[in-house]
């Protein structure tokens, strides 16, 4: 059965999610019925069609004042309703029969916010950013998505950086046993920075994004602890923004219990990328630079040429990700997993009902 979703917030992630839906072929399984965004429809359609990072969308896009239209090669089109509602409790999710709201605003993230979408008629909510501790689950697809149940109505997809580093941490921990670690995120500039010097509550972010490498706060270590409780207080992280518009590199250093060599580490990463985490983690030894990972759908790409081992127990890795495109693809994967958990519960109920009838 087709999953009906609505996108709340049509910025970098919201637009990437919609484009990834069609480029991945998942539009055969997911139907976007509405987009809620305060911007003008003309600008929404234009930025969906043309993107400075991801190029031109391969599907023709048009609009009227109430809809986005996505054209198909066979002459048919998808009509997506445009909403301009700032109060999420007033959104018509009930009338539109929305299964899951993909909240890509970056603004909402509490249980109360999720319940507001549900009160408006949505069955479930998936936040595109780290959320409060009182939500039902935080999912890093490929690592813990199988923990989803039908009872998980308010879910977070974590962040682009947790989706990048957590699967790699799992691989290393499963193979060698991690004791502790540190992470430096080297992140492309974002739209919370200034084009030229201007006011911001974070004084470092008052400075022009194109002119400096800018340290920013990060709570990545908290996200790791949420997914792996055994690593609470075992990881620390720092982050810097650099003057590129997309793609992020992550410098991961971990101490492990087992004696290891570089070849051991790379073999473990390469093998898992070809089996259990295929499509989530990739491995390369090609001499690539950041632009080469633009529009890559993987959560993480390990650069095996940069793997280092010191004193047999300290591992250093360089891991790349397209912080927009990879994350947008995981939003779709997680939404489908949430939907599948409902289908599984329905099947189990039917099976129990048949057994009860047979035994009566």
Curated annotation (Swiss-Prot):
Alphabetized GO MF terms: erythrose-4-phosphate dehydrogenase activity; NAD binding
Q: Name one GO cellular component term.
A: cytoplasm
Key word Secreted present in the record?
no
| Catalytic activity as recorded in UniProt | D-erythrose 4-phosphate + NAD(+) + H2O = 4-phospho-D-erythronate + NADH + 2 H(+)
Where it sits in the cell: the answer is: Cytoplasm
Per UniProt, where does NAD(+) bind? 12-13, 323
* SMART domains in the cross-refs: Gp_dh_N (SM00846)
Q: What is its EC number?
A: 1.2.1.72
Question: Site feature Activates thiol group during catalysis: at which residues?
Answer: 187
Annotated substrate binding lies at: 159-161, 205, 218-219, 241
Q: Name one Pfam family in it.
A: Gp_dh_N
One GO biological-process annotation of the entry reads: pyridoxine biosynthetic process
Where does it primarily localize? cytoplasm
**What superkingdom heads the lineage?**
Bacteria
Which residues are the active-site ones?
160
Sorted alphabetically, which keywords does the UniProt record give? Cytoplasm, NAD, Oxidoreductase, Pyridoxine biosynthesis
Functionally, this protein is described as follows: Catalyzes the NAD-dependent conversion of D-erythrose 4-phosphate to 4-phosphoerythronate.
User: Which family does this protein fall into?
Assistant: Belongs to the glyceraldehyde-3-phosphate dehydrogenase family. Epd subfamily.
- Subunit description: Homotetramer.
| The name this protein goes by in its record | D-erythrose-4-phosphate dehydrogenase
Q: Which gene is transcribed and translated to give this protein?
A: epd
């Amino acid at each position: 059965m087709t999953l009906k979703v609505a996108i709340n917030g049509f910025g970098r992630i919201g637009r990437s999610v919609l484009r990834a839906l069609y480029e991945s072929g998942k539009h055969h399984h997911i139907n976007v019925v509405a987009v809620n965004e305060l911007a003008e429809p003309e600008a929404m359609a234009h930025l969906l069609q043309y993107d400075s990072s991801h190029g031109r969308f391969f599907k023709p896009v048009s609009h009227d004042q109430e809809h986005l239209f996505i054209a198909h090669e066979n002459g048919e089109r998808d009509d997506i309703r445009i909403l301009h509602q700032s109060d999420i409790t007033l959104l018509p999710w009930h009338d539109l029969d929305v299964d899951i709201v993909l909240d890509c605003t970056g603004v909402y993230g509490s249980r109360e916010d999720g319940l507001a979408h549900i009160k408006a008629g949505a069955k479930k909510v998936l936040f595109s950013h780290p959320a409060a501790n009182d939500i039902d689950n935080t999912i890093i697809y490929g690592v813990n998505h199988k923990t989803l149940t039908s009872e998980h109505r308010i879910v977070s997809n974590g962040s682009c950086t947790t989706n990048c580093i957590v699967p790699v941490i799992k691989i290393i921990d499963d193979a060698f046993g991690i004791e502790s670690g540190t992470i430096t995120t080297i992140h492309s500039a974002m739209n919370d920075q200034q084009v030229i010097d201007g006011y911001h509550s974070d004084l470092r972010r008052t400075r022009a994004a194109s002119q400096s490498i800018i340290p920013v706060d990060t709570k990545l270590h908290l996200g790791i602890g949420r997914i792996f409780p055994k690593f609470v207080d075992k990881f620390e992280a720092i982050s810097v923004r650099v003057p590129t518009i997309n793609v992020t590199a992550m410098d991961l250093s971990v101490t492990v219990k087992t004696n290891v060599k570089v070849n051991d580490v790379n073999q473990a990463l390469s093998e898992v990328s070809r089996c259990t985490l295929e499509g989530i983690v990739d491995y390369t030894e090609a001499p690539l630079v950041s632009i080469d990972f633009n529009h890559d759908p993987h959560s993480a790409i390990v650069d095996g040429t940069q793997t280092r081992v010191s004193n047999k127990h300290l591992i250093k890795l360089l891991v790349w990700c397209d912080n927009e495109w990879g994350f947008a693809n995981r939003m779709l994967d997680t939404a489908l997993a949430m939907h599948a958990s409902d289908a599984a519960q329905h099947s189990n109920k039917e099976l129990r009902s048949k057994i009860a009838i047979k035994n009566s």
